[in-house]
Amino acid sequence: MNEMLSRFVNEALSCLIIVPATVLCLLPMKDKMRYSIKNVLPLFLGVLVMVTVIVSGATALLPVEPKVVFYILLVPLFLAYRVIVDADIVKCFATFLLSFTIMSFCKNYAIMIDAVIHPELGTPTFSTDGALIQLGISCAVTAAIAYPVAKYGSHLINGLPYRRVWLISIVMSLMFIGFNFTVQPVHYQTLYLNRVFLVYILITTLMFIMLVLMYTVFYFIASASLKAGKDKEHISVLEMQKKQYDAQQKYLEDTSRIRHDFKHSSLL
């Protein structure tokens, strides 16, 4: 009974990672919110409680892995996200996946610390310490990147309409999520074989740096594409105005010639 309660509490704490993940989802959508935060908060809390209870209860009572249940429950989470933001579904999915990509890196770093504190344990179940550490790392990372995500992310959300560009972002996020879940050790003791722990730290850190660099490059390429589109539109407007100006000039010249001919014929 105590073990079951412990698993329930640990999974409930692990599910709280949804809070910083949701913040990262909403920051770039700050100009696309259908409702105010005051109206969104009850929906968010309701979904959070539902996911927490279902994942924790299923993990404690059934012989299933928590991440399987959690993945299934990402569907209602995404649907709730779609309800509260007014943006293209591809943009929503790209932002949603990027948020959980960052959270998956936070989980890997929490696993490293948990493996030091409790080397006898392993995934997918965190210790209470590990769950709290994961939440702390996730909140710290969210706070650190909140400003650039809100400023530059919203710039792309508001101005970049090209679906293909957002699909590239989705593919990138899926690659990193796949990596993070592939390298997570089933038993922490595996990390203490030879230099596995060091390799785990290095490869996770390198992949996180790669994530930051790739999305930085993605931002500049997308911004350049957006600027090129605006420049092309501006040039089209200028060409249209030039055609109108030329037409008006021709009309004035023709009118002036007609008036001159009429005046000349009247004098005769």
Label every model-predicted segment.
Residues 1-9:
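Short, strongly hydrophobic alpha-helical membrane anchors
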Residues 15, 19-41, 53-174, 179-188:
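Juxtamembrane segments at transmembrane-helix boundaries
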Residues 169-176, 236-256:
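Cytosolic juxtamembrane regulatory segments of multi-pass membrane proteins
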Residues 10-15, 262:
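Membrane-interface micro-motifs in multi-pass membrane enzymes
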Residues 145-158, 179-191, 207-236:
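Juxtamembrane or sensor-core-proximal signal-transducing alpha helices
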Residues 253-267:
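Conserved phosphoacceptor histidine of two-component systems
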Residues 196-205:
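Hydrophobic alpha-helical transmembrane segments
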